[in-house]
């Protein structure tokens, strides 16, 4: 190992949401004097307003700290802050590939949760040295010994050296830094070998093009050097290099073991994919990093501007968002009910919420979003296989030989007293139990196969409510399985509304259709004529509700007298309503599309 690397330590922090990861990062920055008290704002590394508000980290960040250890030597510590949510699992695995060690933060009041575990297993897969930290010991309900035991039982790590700390109060921070220096191995790698670096994040800067966050493993990268991206063979010239300490500053070179920023005139963020390998164009490395994959969206929904005039603005906003988020996809689509808009693809539910919230918040757009749907695999009668992300595109029933839907393997961690309620919820969602094991006396891990379509709506919210907020969920895609699925159309006055179509399991179709019609009846405003709301599978109507018409009393001015006069007036009114119904069209309000989302409740 090169002597010059022996002072470098690359590490990340793993934690479940809300276990105090970003606060701990703030304290490390303060303790090492990287940021002054005045500059330190809470959650320094979560730059997006949304990240701070939701208390989650969405994009990976890095920061370089200088630290003088108790042995008198100066160390360079690179903290690679990773997203903790399961939607961003691939980004996490790439960020981990860039480290040699990880701090495992466990909340002293909550214990080990599902996403902590999922991320720990990833860290172990990458052979990282794990430093356990038990955080929030200042809280009255903290149970340090219990959690220490849990780390040993559930994860199988030796926790006798686990550092008890409180990031909020600044307790134990010095001890954590010492552990990083002494336990995390220094990076290996030869600065003179051919260049080999991994991209673990990229974003778009309007002045400099795409900025890549990289970790150099072999060789050295310098300005004016020609580099090549492995996955697409494109070549670029390096313009500038930098590190965050914690604000960007330029450097002359990045050597093996270092983490930094490379700007190389890349114009399209899709060229700099997370997990890709960078090498020298003239003297390339032999092998790229293993494990690179193009992330595929799992959940889709339509996004339409409420004002048709905002279409261009929405397109620009989506373009800018996708510059920073290579996992997010979008393509134009039209809907008879909603006009022009886009079909967007996301990694998961949280990702979807974040994208929609950013569109509304950062670009001030008023949007209608359709119900999320997943990618179905359709085999038609001629044997051709097609993937469909929009229920409206499903071929007619008689042409479908089989329909397959994506399944997830879900790992749920919960308290033992909530097991019954959780099992019931999973059964309702067509889940198949795979495993149930008790971790100690208080916690349990439940493994289920559940169709993604059942998780997409509000599984997570329901899980939180049946477990009073204690259960945590982690999932991975298992593959496609055949299912008895049908397309449920909603007709309003006999006209199908494409944006309200959903694909459901046949057993559920009747119930779902009835619920939907009832919901829609409440939100569609009364007209001067009756409005029929029907749910149909193919040509068969399975549920109907009617929105009653406004009715003027045409007999008000008749007193007594002949019945035929009254009958004439009523007939005339009926005739008029019939004519209106033929030409009238029903305005469908925004709430109607939300009703589809809420039907599950």
From Swiss-Prot:
Its EC number is 3.6.5.n1. GO terms for biological process: positive regulation of translation. Required for accurate and efficient protein synthesis under certain stress conditions. May act as a fidelity factor of the translation reaction, by catalyzing a one-codon backward translocation of tRNAs on improperly translocated ribosomes. Back-translocation proceeds from a post-translocation (POST) complex to a pre-translocation (PRE) complex, thus giving elongation factor G a second chance to translocate the tRNAs correctly. Binds to ribosomes in a GTP-dependent manner. InterPro entries: EF-4 (IPR006297), EFG_III/V (IPR035647), EFG_V-like (IPR000640), EFTu-like_2 (IPR004161), G_TR_CS (IPR031157), LepA_C_sf (IPR038363), LepA_CTD (IPR013842), LepA_IV (IPR035654). Residues 6-188 form the tr-type G domain. Keywords: Cell inner membrane, Cell membrane, GTP-binding, Hydrolase, Membrane, Nucleotide-binding, Protein biosynthesis. One of its GO terms (cellular component) is plasma membrane. NCBIfam families: lepA, small_GTP. It is found in: Cell inner membrane. This is Elongation factor 4. Its main location: membrane. It is a peripheral membrane protein. Belongs to the TRAFAC class translation factor GTPase superfamily. Classic translation factor GTPase family. LepA subfamily. It catalyses: GTP + H2O = GDP + phosphate + H(+). It comes from Anaeromyxobacter dehalogenans (strain 2CP-1 / ATCC BAA-258). Pfam families: EFG_C (PF00679), GTP_EFTU (PF00009), GTP_EFTU_D2 (PF03144), LepA_C (PF06421). GTP binds at residues 18-23, 135-138. One of its GO terms (molecular function) is GTPase activity. It is an enzyme of class 3 (hydrolase). Gene3D superfamilies: 3.30.70.240, Elongation factor 4, C-terminal domain, Elongation Factor G (Translational Gtpase), domain 3, P-loop containing nucleotide triphosphate hydrolases, Translation factors.
């Amino acid at each position: 190992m090169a002597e010059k690397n022996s002072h470098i330590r690359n590490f990340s922090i793993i934690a479940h949401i809300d276990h105090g990861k970003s606060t701990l990062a703030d304290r490390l920055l303060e303790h090492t004097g990287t940021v002054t008290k005045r500059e330190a704002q809470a959650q320094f590394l979560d730059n997006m307003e949304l990240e701070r508000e939701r208390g989650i980290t969405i994009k990976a960040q890095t920061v370089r700290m200088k630290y003088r250890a108790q042995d008198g030597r100066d160390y360079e510590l690179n903290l690679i802050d990773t997203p903790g949510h399961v939607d961003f699992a691939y980004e996490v695995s790439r960020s981990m590939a860039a480290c040699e060690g990880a701090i495992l933060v466990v909340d002293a009041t909550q214990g080990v949760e599902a996403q902590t575990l999922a991320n720990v297993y990833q860290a172990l897969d990458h052979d990282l040295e794990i430093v356990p930290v038990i955080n929030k010991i200042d809280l009255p309900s903290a149970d340090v010994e219990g959690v220490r035991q849990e780390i040993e039982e559930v994860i199988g790590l030796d926790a006798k050296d686990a550092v008890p700390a409180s990031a909020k109060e600044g307790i134990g921070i010095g001890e954590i830094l010492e552990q990083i220096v002494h336990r995390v191995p220094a990076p290996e790698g030869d600065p003179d070998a051919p260049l080999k670096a991994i991209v673990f994040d990229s974003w778009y800067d309007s002045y400099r093009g795409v900025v890549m966050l990289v970790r150099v493993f072999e060789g050295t990268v310098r300005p004016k050097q020609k580099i090549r991206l492995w996955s697409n063979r494109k070549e670029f010239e390096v313009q500038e290099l930098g590190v965050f300490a914690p604000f960007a500053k330029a450097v002359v070179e990045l050597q093996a073991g270092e983490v930094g920023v490379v700007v190389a005139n890349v114009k399209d963020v899709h060229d700099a994919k997370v997990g890709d390998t960078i090498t020298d164009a003239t003297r390339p490395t032999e092998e790229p990093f293993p494990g690179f994959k193009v992330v595929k969206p799992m959940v889709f929904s339509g996004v339409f501007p409420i004002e048709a005039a905002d279409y261009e603005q929405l397109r620009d906003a989506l373009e800018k968002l996708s510059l920073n988020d290579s996992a997010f996809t979008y393509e134009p689509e039209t809907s008879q009910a909603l006009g022009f808009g886009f079909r967007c693809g996301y990694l998961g539910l949280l990702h979807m919420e974040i994208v929609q919230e950013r569109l509304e918040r950062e670009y001030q757009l008023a949007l209608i979003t359709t119900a999320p749907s997943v990618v179905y695999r359709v085999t038609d009668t001629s044997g051709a296989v097609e993937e469909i992300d929009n229920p409206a595109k499903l071929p007619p029933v008689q042409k479908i030989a089989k329909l397959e839907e994506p399944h997830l393997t879900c790992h749920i961690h919960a308290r033992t007293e909530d097991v019954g309620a959780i099992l019931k919820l999973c059964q309702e969602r067509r889940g198949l139990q795979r495993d149930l094991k008790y971790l100690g006396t208080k916690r349990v891990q439940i493994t289920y196969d559940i169709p993604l379509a059942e998780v997409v709506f509000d599984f997570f919210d329901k899980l939180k409510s049946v477990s009073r907020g204690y259960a945590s969920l982690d999932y991975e895609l298992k593959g496609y399985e055949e299912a008895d699925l049908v397309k449920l159309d909603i007709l309003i006055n006999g006209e199908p509304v494409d944006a309200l179509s959903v694909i459901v399991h046949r057993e559920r179709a009747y119930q779902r259709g009835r619920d939907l019609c009832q919901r829609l009846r409440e939100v569609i405003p009364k007209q001067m004529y009756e409005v029929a709301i029907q749910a149909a599978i193919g040509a068969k109507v399975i549920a109907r509700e009617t929105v009653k018409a406004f009715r003027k009393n045409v007999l008000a001015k008749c007193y007594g007298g002949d019945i035929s006069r009254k009958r004439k007036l009523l007939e005339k009114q009926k005739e008029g309503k019939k004519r209106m119904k033929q030409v009238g069209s029903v305005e469908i309000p925004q709430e109607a599309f939300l009703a589809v989302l809420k039907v599950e409740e």
